């Protein structure tokens, strides 16, 4: 199914919670959300890419990892946004190029659009951790004065 997302300004937390609630209905895994990001600090472009990247990583954990627990953590510190999606699933070998499939490339593309860095940590039997880090733009920080 295709998932289209449009966000109104200031609704990041609600959109994220709604999307994860929808996905939780498709799995027995427990999805835990800790969102400390203020919607005010995110523009609509950032919100869409963040929610979609989190969605893709969560779907990967549900479909491929056989995870029982998925943790989503969103935080901002000194102008740096960090989003972590971690699961306790089967994990995979990062050197297995067959696993560099469509979903991973979409997440990399979204990270690039945010001018951020996407790190994936995993090993067979060790679950998976996806970490996106990016710097808030200077223009946005000036608007908050």
How should these model regions be labeled?
Residues 1-145:
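Coiled-coil dimerization/phosphotransfer module
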């Amino acid at each position: 199914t295709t998932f289209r997302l449009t966000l109104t300004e200031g609704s990041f937390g609600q959109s994220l919670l709604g999307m994860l609630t929808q996905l939780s209905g498709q799995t027995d895994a427990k999805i835990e959300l800790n969102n400390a990001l203020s919607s005010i600090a995110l523009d609509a472009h950032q919100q869409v890419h963040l929610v979609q990247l989190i969605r893709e990583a969560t779907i990967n954990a549900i479909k491929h990892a056989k995870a029982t627990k998925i943790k989503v953590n969103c935080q901002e510190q000194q102008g740096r946004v960090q989003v972590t999606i971690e699961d306790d699933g089967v994990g995979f070998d990062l050197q297995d190029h067959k696993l560099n499939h469509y979903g991973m490339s979409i997440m990399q593309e979204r990270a690039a659009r945010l001018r951020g860095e996407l790190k994936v940590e995993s090993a067979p039997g060790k679950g998976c951790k996806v970490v996106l880090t990016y710097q808030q733009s200077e223009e946005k920080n000036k608007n908050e004065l």
